[in-house]
Amino acid sequence: MSNQINFTFQDSDWVPPTNYPDLRNAKEIAIDLETKDPEIKIKGPGWPTNNGNVIGIAVATDTFKGYFPVAHEAGGNMDMMMTLKWVQDICRSKATKIFHNASYDIGWLRANGIVVYGDVADTMIAAALIDENRRMYSLNALSVDFISELKSEAGLKEAAQDWGIDAKAEMFKLPAKFVGPYAEQD
């Protein structure tokens, strides 16, 4: 009888961007943060109390999309300081910055010394202004209703199951290669 346990983990072909593109001339820049926020459901966002951290930053324009992992516990990260400097340059640009639940992401950006300048568009607030009686304001629900697209979480959930973790609450424990495809969809 063998005591050996065999594991078969899902693999991913995703790799992070190889450079930091100059996006300062874009008209609109969408930004979404992936975070480790362990007590968000109990105490609210961790950025005001320094409880948690940013694990990656997804950025998209009309010609570019990329996920920049910076603090995944299982690796695959880019240089944190270089990435934050690049994001600061983007946030200083004249482009409209687009977020979903902007107060959360901007709070984490500010906790990392990044100030967002210029116009900010929040898709969650916009959705409430369009239809205050919606049942759900999640990005997935809005995507289905307004652009007929559904974000695929299958790869993320499968990897999380392989690693024995919660796909959303413990995303920070996964290697970046499993989070990248998910994060770039936002």
Language-model segments: what does each one mean?
Residues S2-F9, G52-Q185:
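Active-site-proximal helix-loop-helix substrate-binding element of RNase H-like nuclease domains
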Residues M1-N50, M80-C91:
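Long, highly charged low-complexity segments
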